[in-house]
Amino acid sequence: VIISVYKNDNAVFFSRALDSITESQTIIPNEIVLVVDGPISKEIEDVISEYTKKYVIFKVIRLKKNVGLGKALKLAIENSTYELIARMDSDDVSVPTRFEEQLAYFELKPETDVLGGDITEFIGEEHNIVGKRVVPLSNDCIREFMKERCGMNHVSVMYKKEAVKQAGSYLDLFWNEDYYLWIRMWMKNAVFANTGSVLVNVRVGTDMYKRRGGSKYFKSEKKIQDYMLKYGMISYPLYIKNIAKRLQDGKI
């Protein structure tokens, strides 16, 4: 498992996230690579101390300065021991059977490179579900879907380390590090899949929606469209359609 934490993260939410991938999981991972992205609060430090004392599976990497999510996750992958890596966010909640389901799928279909699932979104209490993001199941459907929208829920994925590295791993791109990676893996003919079940409950709020808007976010979205057009993943008419859709959705 790879996870990154930084100063603006909430210690209570972070603790719940760690609980969901350790104590609450039906299969506890062999390793959790935690990147501390720059200075953090005492509260977050206390959470790290609590879990590293309780579980020897933690490998903590500390960065003096904040480098951003893309670089932090790339570093986490480089320091991962195992070929199968699960992605986890610092304030979300994995369902108890998440790793069990994903490992069983990889055993059944070992040709898979990236495996995700659906997510629910909640505000405040975990039972206060306000949304659900359902993604396509098969490789063919996901690859087609990727031409217009991201076909994987980043917080839910488990992937093969080598397949990610072959595509150049994570690169910084404001709020779009994942989509940018999937596109490059798409071009390397990686095999995608989704389980069709909810794997992660995602904590959302107005702050998240604010960040996923404005000119900075639009520029990162446009960069992805430019990249897909340049390398022949999409046609020019689809490029125009995708840009127009993002303008219409208020991402600028």
Q: Where are the language model's segments positioned?
A:
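Glycine-rich, basic loop-to-helix element that forms the pyrophosphate-binding segment
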Residues: 63-80, 101
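Short, well-formed alpha-helical segments that are part of the catalytic scaffolds
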Residues: 9-24
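Conserved donor NDP-sugar-binding/catalytic core segment of glycosyltransferases
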Residues: 97-130
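A conserved acidic beta->alpha catalytic loop
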Residues: 36-45, 89
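Short alpha-helix within the catalytic core of nucleotide-sugar-dependent glycosyltransferases
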Residues: 18-19, 45, 74, 82, ...
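Short loop->beta transition adjacent to catalytic acidic/histidine clusters or analogous donor-positioning motifs
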Residues: 22-34, 55-59
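Short aromatic/hydrophobic "clamp" motif used to bind/position activated sugar donors
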Residues: 85
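Conserved nucleotide-sugar donor-binding catalytic segment
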Residues: 4, 136-215
